[in-house]
Amino acid sequence: MLGVTTYLTTDVAPFPLFWVLPLALYLATFILVFARRPVYAPPWMGRVLCLPALVLMVSFIIEATHPPAVFVALHLLMFGAAALICHSELAKDRPASEHLTEFYLWMSVGGVLGGMFNALLAPLLFKQVLEYPLVMLMACAFAPRVGEQRGFNRGDILWPAALGLLTLALVLAVQAAGSEPGRASTLAIFAVPALLTYRFVLRPIRFSLCLAAILAASATYVGAHGRTLLVERNFFGVVRVTQDVNGRFHQLVHGGTLHGRQHLDPARTGEPLAFYHRTGPAGDAFRLFNTVAASLPPRVGLIGLGVGALATYAKPEQAWDFYEIDPAVERIACDPRLFTFMSQCAASRLRVVLGDARLKLRDAPDGHYGMLVLDAFSSDSIPVHLLTREALRLYCAKVADGGLLAFHVSNRRLDLKPIVASLAADAKLAGCDREDFDITADERRDGKEISEWIVLSRRADLIHQLARDPRWQPLPPASGPLWTDDFSNLLMALRWK
């Protein structure tokens, strides 16, 4: 349960309320098998478990999570079947009434140990969320056996070995071509061994071992984000540094979300890419700031570090403060072997402040910054407390009169523009928005990504300067309830299409 909950709420559909669904399935299956008239897993339940497990194992390897609704349904179907099967085995082994107390005690101890493993040991043992696919394999091994397909024979060793070698050969053959694998070739690499594995669905041990062999062979697979150079896992999730297949960029990926990239060409390492491209809204916002910088404090605050790409906009006379909550991100961004934006920054003073931005920002004097950039909302799981009325009041207090607030609101799952528009209207701030969604194929190959930024200010004339560019549009009228420290509703921000 903890494994599927962690994976669902970090990689597939990062939405806090989704933890309720696996818990509900867990409790429902527990109630069914321990009821007065128990409902045990029927023999065909093994097929219900193994088919989605097969699809999900392949999706785990190739990092496929779209469309989210389909994958959420598959994960819940697999977990529900696994929970019913495992709870059925527990219920069938239930002892006589005089030993029930001990039975339930040890069952609870097992739950505690499993929770401790997931929470404490798994992040130390695994760089990825591997505890989930490993438990998935174990659940498939416990699936009910049907007919005469029982026992263990040499086929249970030879077939997994053969499928593992086949997968490895397919991976190496595609990568030897030297180009980024397309959807068809990626699917073929793992779909062929997976289809061969399904013929063993009536032999749970062999089926699980074949899946395990495919998973092991996939370690050499270069995924959608390229070759992995570094992986770190902590309380905040899994961050990876990758090099794209064509060897042009280093990239920072958190879960399944890109957080920045840098050219490896020494002549172009100083170019901001991805969501921070000079031809995008980030470039427009900093050009506007530089036109009025003489009348503002020469200090810029940024909430969210990423790879430090925004540091390329710094001027020698300026001081820049990055507020970052994840120490792993700070180590990666400041390591010149991975990214050099920070070491090349032209600012007279560059500082990274570790900790929660709202708490740390309180220590800055009022009116301290000429510009404050909020770049903490591109992940699928956003820090809601940075997007409330009280948070905006804090930002306004720390920015000088006439200064700028820039919100990076690019997000695959959430439409944050109406939320920011309501906050701006409540604070009586002028603002406009640019959706940079129509980028060319050449721009994408050159490292640019689609992005959306919102700029706010007390000075309406500055916003009017931006709005002279027709790509910058006024914010929509305030609608819906205002987010505060006491109220927020992610459902109203979800992109349902």
Question: Where is each model-derived feature located?
Answer:
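Alpha-helical transmembrane segments of multi-pass membrane proteins
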Residues: 1-473, 478, 488-497
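Acidic/polar residues in short coil/turn loops that connect beta-strands
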Residues: 484-485
